[in-house]
Design a protein with these regions (language model features):
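FAD-dependent oxidoreductase catalytic-site/capping-region signature
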Residues: 1-144, 152-170
């Protein structure tokens, strides 16, 4: 199963000082306070089973491969889901965007200023990708991410010129 809209709030950290090394990511699936992730996966598997038993699907089935016929209770389904759940395609939202100095209800602070996409406390560093999105759209996010990138490019172009002169004081 794919955790498309997990309510778990994971974390991202650097694995080494090597800038080419991939970062470490812990998505923290199934760790949300209200149990949403677990309910979503368990119910999703139950619904998939019901759909598979309807014609015309049923006539093509030989047997259920995963999670398998022995996996029937909510507890067993949850255990299975926890062992195989993963993110598909587009992890995002690792750089909280908002108004600087504002903390969210969970105490996390803003990393990127929403008005100019600048990293809080940095003069000329902007983040213009999916990491500033608080949630992903339900469709492929390519156009949304493209829009963020276009806005970032517009802001950079605007800042590159002051009174008709190209800035040199970056």
């Amino acid at each position: 199963p794919n955790a498309m809209r997990s309510r778990g709030r994971g974390k991202l950290w650097l694995a080494s000082s090597d800038p080419t090394a991939k970062p470490m990511i812990d998505f923290k699936y199934f760790e949300d306070k209200d149990g949403y992730d677990e309910r979503l996966m368990v119910e999703g598997i139950k619904i998939a089973r019901k759909v598979a038993q309807q014609e015309p699907f049923r006539q093509h089935l030989v047997r259920e491969v995963a999670p398998g016929p022995a996996c029937q209770t909510d507890e067993d389904i949850s255990k299975y889901a926890r062992s195989v759940a993963h993110t598909v395609y587009h992890p995002a939202g690792t750089c909280r965007m908002g108004t600087p100095n504002d903390a969210s209800e969970d105490g996390r602070t803003v990393v990127v200023d929403q008005k100019d996409l600048k990293v809080v406390g940095m003069r000329s560093l902007r983040i213009c990708d999916a990491s500033v999105l608080p949630t992903l759209p339900s469709v492929n996010p390519m156009l949304t991410i493209l829009m963020v990138g276009e806005r970032g490019a517009e802001l950079i172009r605007k800042d590159a010129w002051v009174n008709g002169e190209r800035r040199t004081d970056w």
